[in-house]
Amino acid sequence: MKMEVLKIKKLHPDAHVPTRAHDTDAGMDLYALPVEYTDKEKSDIKNKLAAKALLQSATAFDLDLLWAATDSDWEQAFAKGIYIFPHETVMVPTGIAVAVPTGYMGCIYARSGLASKHGLAPANCVGIVDSDYRDEVKVALHNYSNEPYVIDVGERIAQLVIQPISLCTPVEVDELDETERGSAGFGSTGK
């Protein structure tokens, strides 16, 4: 089997080139870079963290520490992690662009541990990177859990799998070929 080359361009000095844990793994891990939050997003995150602390009966001391944090403290926190609250989606940058070979597509799948332990997975279930796309690969990561999660900068957030595709030409017809199954749909083949 011919081994194709996946060209990868780092768009950010801290970006990680995708890696495989084992030579025969299908997926290459994608790594998180910091999100550049707007001032409103930063304010929203602070308020959500305070609300969570209140709901969890945080002590007055804990709340004082939260509110006493300086802008510099918050900037350091935002540079080190990506805050993803329950049932929210965040576009997580990877800092890389890829040149998927013609005749292939890049599929962005969940990492099993992140999905099963923390409820984090691509919002679109499977992200697609077409062979002619050359901008930054980002992961629309959704938190399906009821707990907030902080993604560390440099954390593995998804996996990229390169798969062959068949480029069929769509043609409108008046009739389709008959098959034994016909129009029998969901559940028609039994349990």
Segments predicted by a language model, with ranges:
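DUTPase catalytic domain/fold
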Residues: 1-191
